[in-house]
């Protein structure tokens, strides 16, 4: 990976006149930086084929019962500072988002060209999420880290890299929905990047139908939103807007922003109540999700793991690959290692093994066939501070060619209400 200080840094400020709407919700100040960085430079040359000693080191960190020794500022001395603080010859000269009529417009999401190294500074925890202000991911970031400085990113990969490059301190990203299933992209990114899972948070999805002030439902000829949101409100939309066309948009809150920015009086969006507040839209219908049990699970990611404990329920996430030529038959042995120790599994997900996608089986007399090879993601209810979890993983290691602990973290045990728009 190229050294951060060798990036071709370019700077830009956000033009407040680029939007034709003034929003009422004050958003924390943002900074925008452009860098000649390319995403492929973060690909690990050996893919997922890390050594066993690598995994053992990670496991030792997670199972340690001794608090980590804190860095005494040495790292901060080596990384360029921001907001007027300099390091050596590097001065980022960042400019905060300007205001219009005394009100701050919602910040533009970080893109892949906005990534530039920055250290921890100030008292607010900076949390990256995918989407624009008003997205459900922003609500998850606020629940996970109250009073944080939320940083919108236009892609999941950018959110990962924002943490790695010290632009953000944490990332909060979705991994599964109770109706839509797993978000495979983020499972792949968990393996590609070296961030650690330090927590989880579950958010009820509370959809609203939004439009410009004064627009009635019978005037709506088009409804836009994320494909999952449109699918989750299909029956309600059939009743509310039976003749309206439905068009996919990349993000729920971005759909609301698009209507507001372009003054579209014939278009409605499926998004959160917070998006209506941010983009000066009215709520035509509240709580239009077809299934009240619509919940999205988010993971909290950090550069360093947390010390696992036993005084509260913990969950541990791992990823592994079967030994070569063994195929998925070893999955039974792996699962037995947990069952024998009375460890409950909460999630099993398979993803293609990108380094070894196919396995040739058979002999010359009857020909050969090709089977797919997979990586397996498993969540189980135990802390890495517990001997049973350590012993289970020691046995699992015997059956696998690759094993990595993604994190051992507290389970989200907080109650939530499906009827509150504040949750969305």
Swiss-Prot record:
Signal peptide: none annotated. InterPro entries: ACT-like_dom_sf, ACT_dom, Preph_deHydtase, Preph_deHydtase_CS. Keywords: Amino-acid biosynthesis, Aromatic amino acid biosynthesis, Chloroplast, Lyase, Phenylalanine biosynthesis, Plastid, Transit peptide. Its main location: plastid. The keyword Plastid applies. It comes from the Eukaryota. It is found in: Plastid, Chloroplast stroma. It catalyses: L-arogenate + H(+) = L-phenylalanine + CO2 + H2O. Residues 1-34 form a transit peptide. Converts the prephenate produced from the shikimate-chorismate pathway into phenylalanine. This is Arogenate dehydratase 4, chloroplastic. It comes from Arabidopsis thaliana (Mouse-ear cress). The gene is ADT4.
């Amino acid at each position: 990976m190229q050294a951060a200080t060798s990036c071709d840094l370019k700077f830009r400020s956000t033009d407040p006149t680029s939007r034709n709407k003034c929003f009422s919700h004050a958003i924390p100040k943002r900074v925008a930086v452009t860098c000649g960085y390319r995403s492929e430079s973060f690909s690990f040359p050996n893919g997922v084929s890390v050594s066993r000693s690598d995994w053992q080191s990670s496991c030792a960190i997670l199972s340690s019962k001794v608090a980590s020794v804190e860095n005494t500022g040495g790292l901060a001395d080596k990384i360029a500072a921001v907001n007027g603080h300099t390091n050596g010859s590097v001065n980022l000269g960042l400019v905060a988002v300007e205001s219009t009529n005394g009100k701050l417009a919602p910040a533009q999401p970080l893109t892949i060209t906005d990534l530039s190294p920055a250290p921890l500074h100030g008292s607010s925890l900076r949390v990256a999420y995918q989407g624009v202000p008003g997205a459900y991911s922003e609500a998850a970031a606020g629940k996970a880290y109250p009073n944080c400085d939320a940083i919108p990113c236009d892609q999941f990969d950018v959110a990962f890299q924002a943490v790695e490059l010290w632009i953000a301190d944490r990332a909060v990203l979705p991994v599964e929905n109770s109706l839509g299933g797993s978000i495979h992209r983020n499972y792949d990114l968990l393996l590609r990047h070296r961030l650690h899972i330090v927590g989880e948070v579950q958010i009820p999805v509370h959809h609203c139908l939004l439009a410009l002030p004064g627009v009635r439902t019978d005037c709506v000829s088009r409804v836009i939103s994320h494909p999952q949101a449109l699918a989750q409100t299909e029956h309600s939309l059939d009743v509310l807007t039976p003749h309206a066309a439905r068009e996919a948009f990349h993000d729920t809150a971005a759909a609301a922003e698009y209507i507001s920015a372009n003054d579209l009086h014939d278009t409605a969006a499926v998004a959160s109540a917070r998006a209506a507040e941010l983009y000066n839209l009215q709520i035509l219908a509240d709580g239009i999700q077809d299934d009240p049990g619509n919940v999205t699970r988010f993971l909290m990611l950090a550069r360093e793991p947390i010390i696992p404990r036993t005084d509260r329920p913990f969950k541990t996430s791992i990823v592994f690959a079967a030994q070569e030529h063994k195929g998925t038959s070893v999955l039974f042995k792996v699962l037995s290692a947990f069952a024998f120790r009375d460890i409950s599994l909460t999630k099993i997900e398979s993803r293609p093994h990108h380094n070894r996608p196919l396995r040739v089986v058979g002999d010359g007399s009857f020909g050969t066939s090709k089977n797919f090879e997979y990586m397996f993601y498993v969540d189980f209810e135990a802390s890495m501070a517990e001997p049973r979890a350590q012993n289970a993983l020691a046995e699992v290691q015997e059956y696998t060619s690759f094993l990595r602990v993604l994190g051992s973290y507290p389970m989200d045990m907080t109650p939530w209400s499906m009827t509150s728009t504040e949750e969305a």
